[in-house]
Amino acid sequence: MMTRAEYIESLRRLNLKVYFMGELIENPVDHPMIRPSMNSVAKTYELAEKPEYQDLMTVYSPLIGKRINRFCHLHQSTEDLVNKVKMQRLMGQKTAACFQRCVGMDAFNAIFSTTYEMDQKLGTEYHKRFTEYMKFVQENDLTVDGAMTDPKGDRSLSPSRQEDPDMYMHVVEVREDGIVVRGAKAHQTGAVNSHEHLIMPTVAMKEEDKDYAISFAVPSDAEGVFMVYGRQSCDTRKMEENADMDLGNAQYGGHEALVVFDNVFVPNERVFMCREYEFAGMMVE
């Protein structure tokens, strides 16, 4: 497992494209607006190192045969679910902020079970692919952004009936070695602090929407991926010189970003759903 320092250094090695207030941020890790949220995620690594919290923050993984950070775990029992909630309470007590790894953890379990059902009914190999992906995540102790929410556009219309087809993430090309996708995921908690984006559908779909029924994973610095960092009223006080008041939680925080996918290639081994529209609702649930 990574230490807090190793996690921070791993973010520095990423070639992220992050825009804030109309400008490309050269160093997201040390940016005063982003650093508090990064500190929250780093706390999940820090507490996993401490002996007094290891029963909550870490767990044995049957996939790789060693202890892992619980945020990378596939739930095996009722006890796992209880300890998940206890871990979240502990993180809330330590940060008083959003620690940004909950949706990724839930996505692991939703996709793991849904891909199993898909393989059983359709004879696909999505579950095998996702199992291998989970081994990769656990071995490398990665923070993964579970990305579900699309911009949506006109919410009275289905994905395929939108005036702008990019309002929902969709497949634009299927190749022998993978797929090309385009669209965006909105309000992505902790996206800038994540090593990977794990994409899921956002609504149940009909056959006419099949190009939008996709699930896949890409590195957060994959070619064609960029993020627009969100902000709230008065939060730029953190950027003011010698600011020492009205900063809210100055040490810890959360953030959301719009993650844009501009014709991003995804290799087959990282595709976990492609046009199996009848399973989109199951994955969402």
Regions found by a protein language model. Name each.
Residues 141-154:
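A short, Trp-centered hydrophobic/proline-enriched beta-strand micro-motif
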Residues 31-35, 61-71, 160-162:
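Glycine-rich loop at the start of a catalytic domain that most often binds anionic cofactors/ligands
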Residues 1-47:
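N-terminal-proximal low-complexity accessory segments that begin disordered
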Residues 46-144:
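Internal helix-loop-helix
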Residues 20, 146-148, 180-182:
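General beta-strand structural signal in soluble alpha/beta enzymes
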Residues 45, 49, 137, 141, ...:
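A generic secondary-structure signal for well-formed alpha-helical elements
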